[in-house]
Amino acid sequence: MGYLLEETLSSNSKTPIVIDDDNELGLMAVRLANAAAFPMVLKAALELGVFDTLYAEASRSDSFLSPSEIASKLPTTPRNPEAPVLLDRMLRLLASYSVVKCGKVSEGKGERVYRAEPICRFFLKDNIQDIGSLASQVIVNFDSVFLNTWAQLKDVVLEGGDAFGRAHGGMKLFDYMGTDERFSKLFNQTGFTIAVVKKALEVYQGFKGVNVLVDVGGGVGNTLGVVASKYPNIKGINFDLTCALAQAPSYPGVEHVAGDMFVDVPTGDAMILKRILHDWTDEDCVKILKNCWKSLPESGKVVVIELVTPDEAENGDINANIAFDMDMLMFTQCSGGKERSRAEFEALAAASGFTHCKFVCQAYHCWIIEFCK
């Protein structure tokens, strides 16, 4: 049963609002129906450099900026005279999600003012080597290459097949990247896993005593760069396809080696598989893991860095939200890819010849899992 609440919506009026369960559900439904607005505004704000601009100002003086001031400080100065008005509309949406803070309208400026919230540091473009950045991840997720794939979801459910292949002439994601240099470069810039590795190294001790560490599918090599900076005695071998290594910078103690993990893997005392297994089917994962097993000594191990899905879909659980969001990304963008549960990782380890699977610690949304020979 509903009741009336007089809520002041402006300085001049009071409007009765009906509050009941149905009204609350209706509000939630409307929010879901319009959910596309937030990520697209987030993407545009990142591309414009809004977060970097606000965060730089907050670091210097902890002060608020008006949309006009923000526009004047962007990396690319807007030619549109209405840019401050449009930025204000974007920023107030971001403020409603606690991404930025909205201050009172300044009488002198005649505009709302905004300041970066702490969460902004995870979206700074220039922060990849420090804590990692989710900026590129957002931009990749809403690039036309991925958006076109999402449009295939209904047909894949009804008819089967591969969503990415349907959208891109039958090609799989990693084959496609070999044909699109722009997207490949953008994809390889996604850097938040560096934050995961740094966070894990605060507590994970599993690299002590390792002499040769192979990062299988290591991309541009930044993971080994981080590990080698803490353990300078380690010789790192960053192993990936030639096209992935083309953009790899040099890191002290790290050698880049080209090859195919489905054929063989360089030998080492230990190996890293960071966000690799979720790209592939169970059968493909077993092939990769068996090649790792062959190249390890008797006491060797594979350090798997992956998200672990909960067994139940709990309402309001942020880890479940992230896990199932990522699982749908794998479903649409990687042919046969998926996020896995503890039981599924244990099954992969056993099928590949490893004696046991140990879940060591969690860093942000990922787990550090050891597959021991």
UniProtKB/Swiss-Prot annotation:
Quaternary state and partners of this protein? Answer: Interacts with B'GAMMA.
Tell me the disulfide pairings in this chain.
none
EC numbers for this chain: 2.1.1.-
Q: Which UniProt keywords apply?
A: Methyltransferase, S-adenosyl-L-methionine, Transferase
Q: What induces it?
A: By the green peach aphid Myzus persicae.
Active site, renumbered? H278
Metabolic or biological pathway, per its Swiss-Prot or TrEMBL entry? Secondary metabolite biosynthesis
- This chain belongs to the protein called Indole glucosinolate O-methyltransferase 4
UniProt xrefs under InterPro entries: COMT-like, O_MeTrfase_dom, Plant_O-MeTrfase_dimerisation, SAM-dependent_MTases_sf, WH-like_DNA-bd_sf, WH_DNA-bd_sf
Q: Does the keyword Transferase apply?
A: yes
SUPFAM superfamilies given in the database record: S-adenosyl-L-methionine-dependent methyltransferases, Winged helix' DNA-binding domain
Origin organism of this chain? Answer: Arabidopsis thaliana (Mouse-ear cress)
Write out the residues that bind S-adenosyl-L-homocysteine.
G217, D240, D260, M261, K274
The gene that this protein is the product of is IGMT4
Biological process terms from the Gene Ontology for this record are: methylation
Task: Give a short account of what the protein does.
Answer: Involved in indole glucosinolate biosynthesis. Catalyzes methoxylation reactions of the glucosinolate indole ring. Converts the hydroxy intermediates 4-hydroxy-indol-3-yl-methylglucosinolate (4OH-I3M) and 1-hydroxy-indol-3-yl-methylglucosinolate (1OH-I3M) to 4-methoxy-indol-3-yl-methylglucosinolate (4MO-I3M) and 1-methoxy-indol-3-yl-methylglucosinolate(1MO-I3M), respectively.
Family assignment from sequence similarity: Belongs to the class I-like SAM-binding methyltransferase superfamily. Cation-independent O-methyltransferase family.
For this UniProt entry, the molecular function terms from Gene Ontology, in alphabetical order, are:
O-methyltransferase activity; protein dimerization activity
